[in-house]
């Protein structure tokens, strides 16, 4: 098949252990490389899932911090592009973070980032209450970037509930693939 690119879509269970999650991601990247993939797509919260919002905010790091440097090295060593579906990027203060999709190329450079625009807030009467907006700063920019797959529109999880975002990615930002 002409112009085909093999992509690995990863499903994993993250936990509150950054090192264990990185070890899992590293193993999955090696498996993808052995299978001939050019890009590996990870889910939201691939690097960490905390017991509560306070723990999650505490581990937030800048994009040039040790967690992301590890993933940049992993991309470089494996010679694969990594689409990291939702990283806990440090926010503008100690009480907030950004839920950031990071695209890393096969030489370990961050090619693009997108901070999740649509926050997941739910209040079920007599049931669960979750307010992502209480600890996460929404992004402002719609982002598409060139990759081995073509032009990729970057989004995070709950964004899928907002078709207008995908219309803008396709028609205003010329995205050919949505990630």
Predicted segment positions?
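Extreme N-terminal starter segment of soluble prokaryotic enzymes
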Residues: 2-7
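Short polar catalytic/cofactor-binding loops
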Residues: 11-16
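Cys-nucleophile CN-hydrolase/nitrilase-fold catalytic domain and related Cys-dependent amidase chemistry
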Residues: 18, 27-107, 111-115, 121-122
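Short, acidic/polar
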Residues: 20-30, 162-169
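Short acidic/polar active-site loop segments enriched in Thr and Asp
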Residues: 38, 175-178
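Active-site catalytic loop in hydrolytic enzyme cores
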Residues: 63, 90-173
């Amino acid at each position: 098949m002409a112009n085909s690119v093999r992509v690995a879509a990863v499903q994993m269970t993250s936990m509150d252990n950054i090192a264990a999650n990185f070890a899992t991601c590293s193993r999955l990247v090696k498996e993808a490389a052995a299978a001939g993939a050019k890009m590996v797509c990870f889910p939201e919260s691939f690097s960490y899932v905390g017991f509560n919002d306070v723990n999650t905010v505490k581990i937030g790091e800048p994009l040039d911090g040790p967690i992301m440097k590890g993933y940049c090295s992993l991309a470089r060593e494996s010679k694969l592009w990594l689409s990291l579906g939702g990283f806990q990027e440090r926010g503008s203060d100690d009480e907030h973070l950004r839920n950031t999709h990071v695209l890393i190329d096969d030489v370990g450079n961050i090619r693009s980032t997108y901070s999740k625009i649509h926050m997941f807030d739910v209040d079920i009467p007599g049931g669960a209450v979750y307010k992502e907006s209480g600890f996460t700063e929404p992004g402002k920019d719609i982002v598409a970037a060139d990759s081995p797959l073509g032009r990729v529109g970057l989004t995070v999880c709950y964004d899928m509930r907002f078709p207008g975002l995908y219309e803008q990615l396709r028609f205003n930002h010329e995205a050919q693939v949505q990630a």
